[in-house]
UniProtKB/Swiss-Prot annotation:
InterPro entries: Fido (IPR003812), Fido-like_dom_sf (IPR036597)
Top-level enzyme category: transferase
EC number(s) reported in the record: 2.7.7.108
Coiled-coil region(s): none
Reaction catalysis annotation: L-tyrosyl-[protein] + ATP = O-(5'-adenylyl)-L-tyrosyl-[protein] + diphosphate; L-threonyl-[protein] + ATP = 3-O-(5'-adenylyl)-L-threonyl-[protein] + diphosphate
Superkingdom in the source lineage: Bacteria
Miscellaneous comment: Defined as class III fido-domain containing proteins, in which the inhibitory helix is present at the C-terminus of the Fido domain.
Activity regulation info: Adenylyltransferase activity is inhibited by the inhibitory helix present at the C-terminus: Glu-186 binds ATP and competes with ATP-binding at Arg-118, thereby preventing adenylyltransferase activity. Activation dissociates ATP-binding from Glu-186, allowing ordered binding of the entire ATP moiety with the alpha-phosphate in an orientation that is productive for accepting an incoming target hydroxyl side chain.
Post-translational modification: Auto-AMPylation at Tyr-183 in vitro.
Binding-site positions, ATP: 67, 104-107, 112-118, 140-143, 186
BP-aspect Gene Ontology terms: protein adenylylation; regulation of cell division
Native organism: Neisseria meningitidis serogroup B (strain ATCC BAA-335 / MC58)
Pfam families per the UniProt record, alphabetical: Fic
Protein known as: Protein adenylyltransferase NmFic
Length: 191
């Protein structure tokens, strides 16, 4: 039996609609109105991707969550943690990745964190370094392993992503293939 969300849609149908929403975010130019590097900006992205699909789209979670034995930031301290993350510097690639890792540890939403946060990361990279990650060249296995280890040491993640940076920040093919790859990381496959 397919897993369902609170509104009663299958995960596959949620992923398909959310992927459509992600493409529309870029095609419409709405991406240019997103706050860059802030919690509010991440909430805007999440709401855009998952609005109408999840009741909690764009809302900071109030429950504790874990994945694969890893507990994300305690809900009791989450808002305070997000303020501190938002204040982290974004001047260098290393600082940006450190901020990305902390946002991943915070995991502010009940679902859809990875897909939203990768778009958020690219916006921060684009604004500050005039680069984005060419996600289609980033191995799912290597990326997930690096993310799993990143709370202890983000060196592996930095090397993996730095090797796949591009200054072709407005290339639609790179953007859309990257979005599809991002959904693939989360288990989505067409068909």
């Amino acid at each position: 039996m397919p897993s369902e969300n609170p509104i009663g849609k299958t995960m596959k149908s949620i992923d398909e609609q959310s992927l459509h929403n992600a493409r529309r975010l870029f095609e419409s130019g709405d991406i240019d109105r997103i706050e860059v590097g802030t919690t509010a900006g991440l909430q805007q992205i999440h709401r855009y991707l998952f609005g109408g699909l999840y009741d909690f789209a764009g809302q900071i979670r109030e429950d504790n969550i874990s994945k694969g034995g890893f507990r994300f930031a305690n809900a009791m301290y989450l808002k305070e943690a997000l303020v501190k993350i938002e204040q982290m510097p974004e001047r260098t690639f290393e600082e940006i990745i450190a901020k990305y890792v902390e946002m991943n540890i915070a995991h502010p939403f009940l679902e859809g964190n990875g897909r939203s946060t990768r778009i958020w990361l690219d916006l921060v990279l684009k604004k500050n370094l005039k680069k984005v990650v060419n996600w289609q060249n980033v191995s799912k296995t290597l990326y997930l392993q690096a993310m799993e280890r990143s709370p202890v040491n983000d060196l592996e993640l930095r090397f993996l992503l730095k090797d796949n940076l591009t200054d072709d920040v407005d290339n639609r093919e790179i953007i859309f293939k990257g979005i599809e790859q991002s959904y693939y990381y989360e288990g989505y496959e067409k068909g």
